[in-house]
Amino acid sequence: MIYQTDNDKLYRYLFKDRAVRGEWVRLNKTFTDTLNSHEYPRIVRNLLGEMMVATNLLTATLKFKGNITIQIQGNGPLKLLLVNGSDSQQIRALARLQDDVYDDITLSELVGNGILVITIAPTNGERYQGVIALDKPTIAECLEDYFIRSEQLQTQLLIRSGEYEGKPVAAGLLLQIMPDGTGSQEDFEHLATLAATVKNEELFGLTAEELLYRLYHEETVEIYPPSAVEFHCGCSLERSGSALLLISDDEIENILTEHGGSIDMQCECCGTHYFFDKKTIEKLKA
């Protein structure tokens, strides 16, 4: 049974005697809202859920206001998968396919010759971008390698996505040595071994407190108040109109003529339709 109180929540916690920190997140309505306007194949849905969980876990490590974008770019059946999340745990995502996808396809087959790009964008400050090879079987393993190479922080990511009680769900754990250098490799490996025993039904069905007790009942764990996670697209008539105005006047006129005097622009993330006739476009130009 799913405990509703911990749906769409992110928890941070600290192992008091080990100098290791952790995070747990579960996406229920957030994941469903993301999928509502799309008919992705099962393997793409699950990968999208994994990427959303990873983005939530990474944004929770930010020490500043801003957002993180994680995207897969490839030349396989999956051309693009993009997730954007903010420090306030608002998230949006989309995928673009360019070929048919079968159920037992591997990540490397799905993406082809692809890369994972992480863009960290502070509200105030310079953007940072890292490019990661998709040379591991899972997104979680690729991101673990990223933390070791870019931040020299031993990190474990356990991410699962699928269905529970007939509904889409994605969840995950992050375990990381404290960046102040006080944590030991031995402590981290001990906790990582315990975390690796987690089952899907535990990630998908237990409360954070119950899950952490199940995994770490002999440890002293301080759990901090949770953050709510939600799907938030951010699209609007004005933003869609700004994109439309990048097209030349002649081309806009041709499109209006071809489509009976109204241009329909649909948001890729949430599926909302925005309609522009000649009068609306003239107002946007004013």
Curated annotation (Swiss-Prot):
The keyword Transferase does not apply. GO terms for biological process: protein refolding. The keyword Cytoplasm applies. It is found in: Cytoplasm. Under oxidizing conditions two disulfide bonds are formed involving the reactive cysteines. Under reducing conditions zinc is bound to the reactive cysteines and the protein is inactive. GO terms for cellular component: cytoplasm. Its main location: cytoplasm. Disulfide bonds join C233-C235, C267-C270. Keywords: Chaperone, Cytoplasm, Disulfide bond, Redox-active center, Zinc. One of its GO terms (molecular function) is protein folding chaperone. InterPro entries: Heat_shock_Hsp33, Heat_shock_Hsp33_C, Heat_shock_Hsp33_N, Hsp33_helix_hairpin_bin_dom_sf. Redox regulated molecular chaperone. Protects both thermally unfolding and oxidatively damaged proteins from irreversible aggregation. Plays an important role in the bacterial defense system toward oxidative stress. Belongs to the HSP33 family. PANTHER family: 33 KDA CHAPERONIN (PTHR30111:SF1). This is 33 kDa chaperonin. It comes from Histophilus somni (strain 2336) (Haemophilus somnus). The gene is hslO.
